[in-house]
């Protein structure tokens, strides 16, 4: 597998306060990787390091020359007094001049929203549009920061199914920040549990047995995951 990004001994601190300590891992091609951890664990900071938005105080980051990254932020703020349609929003990207908007919207099942105004979209619809925009440069790494925030339960299920479908069709890696442990169990190839340092990492089955993971998330969640049953007959490949 291709190593898209490798982090080695990453340390980040702000005003003398440690945010991330001794972070080392590689993001490999064609996988779904989920980043979990409590509030204040440094997840958003780690995402910014991966995206190159902030530089670590210590450590090395190695990026494959073949890497192409798409990013869906946790929230998007825009001025409601400046109405903008989905089509115009998609065309704001500087990455490509000639964009087949309809084709990309069809990929995320949002073609009916092409001429809708952003401020009229539901939470789930907005996430699909952000996802479509992240796909504009055909990324081999897609970074999704809490993609189901503000989305109702049915919308979350649809969005997770879409994410898995995109991974399969595009053969890209997807790094997701998520609190949904059931999704982690069902769809993820690799889990990184963060609490300013990497508490544990590995397959979901391995991570969920880790004592530090249990101390963070509590036995209640572990019992819920223990009764999780696959509703299919295939074998996960890691």
From Swiss-Prot:
CC per GO annotation: plasma membrane
Catalysed reactions, semicolon-separated: Zn(2+)(out) + ATP(in) + H2O(in) = Zn(2+)(in) + ADP(in) + phosphate(in) + H(+)(in)
Amino-acid positions noted as binding ATP in the UniProt annotation, renumbered to this chain: 37-44
Membrane topology per record: Peripheral membrane protein
Organism per entry: Buchnera aphidicola subsp. Schizaphis graminum (strain Sg)
Subcellular location: Cell inner membrane
Oligomer status and interactors: The complex is composed of two ATP-binding proteins (ZnuC), two transmembrane proteins (ZnuB) and a solute-binding protein (ZnuA).
SUPFAM superfamilies: P-loop containing nucleoside triphosphate hydrolases (SSF52540)
Protein name as catalogued: Zinc import ATP-binding protein ZnuC
Main localisation: membrane
Membrane-traversing stretches: none
Coiled coil: none
Family listed: Belongs to the ABC transporter superfamily. Zinc importer (TC 3.A.1.15.5) family.
EC number(s) on file: 7.2.2.20
Domain of life: Bacteria
Ranges of residues in domain ABC transporter: 5-220
Pfam families reported for this sequence: ABC_tran (PF00005)
GO biological process, one term: response to zinc ion
Annotated function: Part of the ABC transporter complex ZnuABC involved in zinc import. Responsible for energy coupling to the transport system.
InterPro entries: AAA+_ATPase, ABC_transporter-like_ATP-bd, ABC_transporter-like_CS, Metal_Ion_Import_ABC, P-loop_NTPase
UniProt keyword annotation of rRNA-binding present: no
Keyword terms of this UniProt record: ATP-binding, Cell inner membrane, Cell membrane, Ion transport, Membrane, Nucleotide-binding, Translocase, Transport, Zinc, Zinc transport
């Amino acid at each position: 597998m291709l190593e898209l990004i490798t982090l080695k001994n990453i340390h980040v601190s702000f005003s003398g306060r440690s945010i991330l300590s001794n972070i080392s891992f590689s993001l490999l091609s064609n996988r779904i990787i989920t980043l979990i951890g409590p509030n204040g664990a440094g997840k958003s900071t780690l995402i910014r390091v991966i995206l190159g938005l902030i530089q670590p105080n210590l450590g090395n980051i190695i990026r494959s020359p073949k890497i192409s990254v798409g990013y869906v932020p946790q929230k998007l703020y825009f001025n409601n007094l400046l109405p903008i349609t989905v089509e115009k929003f998609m065309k704001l990207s500087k990455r490509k001049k000639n964009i087949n908007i309809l084709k990309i919207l069809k990929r995320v099942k949002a073609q009916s929203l092409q001429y809708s105004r952003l401020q009229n979209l539901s939470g789930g619809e907005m996430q699909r549009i952000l996802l479509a925009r992240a796909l504009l440069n055909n990324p081999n790494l897609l970074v999704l920061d809490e993609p189901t925030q503000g989305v109702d339960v049915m919308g979350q299920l649809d969005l997770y199914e879409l994410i898995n479908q995109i991974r399969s069709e595009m053969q890209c890696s997807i790094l997701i920040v998520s609190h949904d442990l059931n999704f982690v169990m069902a769809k993820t190839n690799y889990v990184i549990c963060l609490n300013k340092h990497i508490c544990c990492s590995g397959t979901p089955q391995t991570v969920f047995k880790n004592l530090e993971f249990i101390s963070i998330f509590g036995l209640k969640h572990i019992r819920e995951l223990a009764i999780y049953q696959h509703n299919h007959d295939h074998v996960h490949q890691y």
